[in-house]
Design a protein with these regions (language model features):
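Alpha-helical transmembrane segments and their immediate juxtamembrane cytosolic regions
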Residues: 2-413
Length: 413
């Protein structure tokens, strides 16, 4: 490495990594988080509840799927935003600010602006269809449209809107920091603080403090809510800003010292064991009636906040430990996951309505929803997206290789 290259890395705060293949694991985690979102939304019609919480309530509810929802909801989006912040810092310093902004507008803003009307329009007939079922609720009245701003039904695409907010905030903060900290002393202190935090066994507890406080400031919070989803307003709620913003910012700063991710790899088993215990405790605190609700709410909020970060670290650590090498199949799934997540909700909702009144056991219904939806969506990605303009917008230009299909078959055999 030349002296100029070394100086450049020091200037941007990025240390050389002897194992760049680790980024394959992080890319896999990002795709995994999006695919888990499909599973999570597929569980919603089966969750036992005294009142309908989703477009349709299946006639065969399942506590097992309710537990699956709870577990996924604990860590999925915090993990996603941490990885998003990590890769945002990588992209910013690899491409420069101007290209980074152009790239984010193409890959995040354009899918939101173009995709939202299409997805929302596809959801409307499903809502009308569901209204014909006794357990499908009623069609929203005309006075509810258009929504009165800032209320706005962002649907599951809220994560794109929040990402754009975080990109903008980060660029403003970075510009201000570069102006205030010309010597780099403040950034060096921040790097040291991040390093001390990551190396400490209390790292999940330290990072859990902001979202734990946000939970406790909300008198209506309870464990099944988790971080309140900011899907119904253009003003992102406090819990989402604090919880997901902490994750995004930490991911951005973590990439400045990329070797720190090895700590997560070394502690994967410890974090996994702790995560299982904390999720179990959070579930009990959220589900069992207790004589002192205020005290239990505080305990539940604290436990849930710890579970968020311990599970996030566990999932990333497991991926770093077992998925660091390149895999064509793994890369294909990671690339496809973005498209699948963008389009999945109307498809999943329609299938939920279709099976809701059938006299099938819930495992058969749940499996049917996923086994129909997922292959259809993967097929649409391969045939309509991967080598098309849509694929270029979402994942960058891709040249079809004659050997690609053969390689996929080889890796799966």
């Amino acid at each position: 490495m030349s002296v100029d290259q070394t100086r450049l890395q020091m200037a941007v705060g990025v240390t050389a990594s002897p194992a760049p293949e680790r980024l394959h694991a992080l890319d896999a985690v990002r795709g995994f988080a999006l695919l888990l979102g499909i599973v999570l939304h597929a569980t919603l019609s089966f969750i036992p509840a005294p009142t309908r919480i989703w477009i349709i309530q299946d006639n065969h509810p399942s506590m097992t799927l309710a537990v699956l929802f709870f577990v996924i909801h604990v860590f999925r989006m915090t993990t996603f935003f941490l990885i998003a912040g990590f890769f945002a810092h990588l992209s910013f310093h690899r491409r420069g600010g101007r290209v980074f902004i152009k790239d984010r507008l193409q890959r995040i803003a354009l899918p939101l602006v173009v995709g939202w009307p299409i997805v929302f329009a596809a959801m409307v007939p499903v809502v009308f269809w569901a209204a014909n079922f006794p357990n499908g609720g009623r069609v929203p009245g005309a006075p509810g449209w258009p929504p009165v701003l800032p209320r706005f039904p962002l649907t599951h695409l809220w994560f794109l809107y929040v990402l754009l907010e975080f990109y903008a905030a980060t660029l403003v903060l970075r510009t201000g920091m570069a102006w205030l900290d010309k010597s780099g002393d403040i950034r060096a202190q921040v790097d040291r603080l991040i390093g001390l935090t990551m190396r400490s066994p209390l790292a999940p507890a330290i990072l859990a403090v902001p979202i734990g406080i946000a939970f406790n400031l909300d008198p209506t919070w309870f464990g099944w809510l988790g971080v309140r989803t900011p899907d119904q307003s253009l003003v992102t709620n406090l819990q989402a800003v604090v919880g997901f913003g902490t994750a995004f910012g930490f991911g951005w700063l973590l990439h400045r010292q990329i070797d720190l991710i090895r700590v997560l790899e070394r502690r994967w088993l410890l974090n996994l064991v702790l995560a299982i215990g904390l999720i179990a405790a959070s579930f009990v605190l959220a589900s069992v009636p207790w004589p002192r609700p205020d005290a239990v709410r505080f305990a539940g909020a604290t436990c849930y906040a710890l579970a968020i970060w311990t599970t996030t670290f566990a999932v990333i650590g497991v991926a770093l430990r077992f998925l660091s090498g390149f895999s064509a199949t793994q890369r294909y799934i990671a690339d496809a996951s973005y498209w699948l997540y963008l389009i999945h909700l109307p498809i999943v909702m329609a299938l939920q309505v279709a099976v809701s009144s059938l006299d099938w056991p819930w495992p058969a219904k749940f499996a049917t929803i996923l086994l129909v939806a997922v292959p259809v969506m993967f097929g649409s990605y391969q045939l309509l997206v991967r080598y098309s303009v849509i694929g270029a917008v979402l994942n960058g230009h891709r040249i079809r290789k004659p050997s690609e299909a053969a390689e996929l078959i080889r890796t799966q055999s």
